[in-house]
């Protein structure tokens, strides 16, 4: 899964990790924002790494949590979705706007390649082929609300991504980029 190879999303270990993440996310969401120590403890247990002074506004959603790494002084706004079937690495001082989606998993484009014939499935096997590629976000990045970042994308340092963008390719450092698809508009 973490190497970009096809994986079974119904694997017993993955399901156990996903159920654990959902339980921690429910507790995180129910914890008052005034109890920052408890919220931080939950994030430290949930995520692969959480830097100092990281703030995540609930609701927040992730698949497993253990593949998410967030650098110091980063802020994740309301309603963000991090599908972390591969690593999601966010640098320091990042601002992630509301309803941003960081999506590492994908599926083959052709239905014949994507769908597994039911007769050949084992008991705990997914009927869909899935693979994942990592997402990397540099330091000092601002991703505007409603942006979708697709599998395998790297966003460099000091980048601003405009709201509502669909980022399907790498964005170099020191850039302003936006659009559907997201394209560099100018250097910063």
Where are these predicted regions, by residue range?
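Short, acidic, Ser/Thr-enriched surface-loop or helix-capping motifs
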Residues: 1, 138, 156
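C-terminal/domain-terminus segments
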Residues: 148-182
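Residues at alpha-helix boundaries and short interhelical turns
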Residues: 32-33, 64, 84, 171
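Terminal amphipathic alpha-helical/low-complexity segments used for targeting or macromolecular assembly
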Residues: 1-53, 109-112, 120, 182-188
């Amino acid at each position: 899964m973490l190497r970009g190879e096809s994986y079974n999303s119904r694997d017993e270990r993955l399901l156990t990790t996903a159920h654990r993440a959902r339980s921690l996310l429910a507790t995180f969401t129910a914890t008052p924002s005034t109890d920052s120590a408890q919220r931080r403890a939950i994030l430290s247990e949930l995520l692969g790494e959480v830097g100092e002074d990281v703030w995540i506004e609930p609701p927040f959603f992730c698949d497993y949590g253990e593949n998410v790494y967030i650098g110091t002084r980063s802020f994740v706004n309301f309603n963000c979705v991090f599908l972390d079937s591969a690593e999601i690495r966010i640098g320091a001082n990042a601002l992630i706007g509301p309803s941003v989606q960081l999506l590492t998993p994908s599926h083959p484009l052709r239905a014949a390649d994507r769908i597994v014939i039911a007769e050949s499935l084992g008991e705990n096997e997914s009927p869909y082929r899935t693979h994942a590629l990592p997402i990397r976000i540099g330091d000092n990045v601002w991703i505007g609300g409603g942006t979708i970042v697709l599998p395998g994308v790297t966003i460099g340092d000091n980048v601003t991504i405009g709201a509502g963008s669909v980022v399907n390719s790498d964005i170099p450092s020191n850039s302003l980029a936006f659009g559907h698809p997201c394209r560099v508009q100018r250097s910063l």
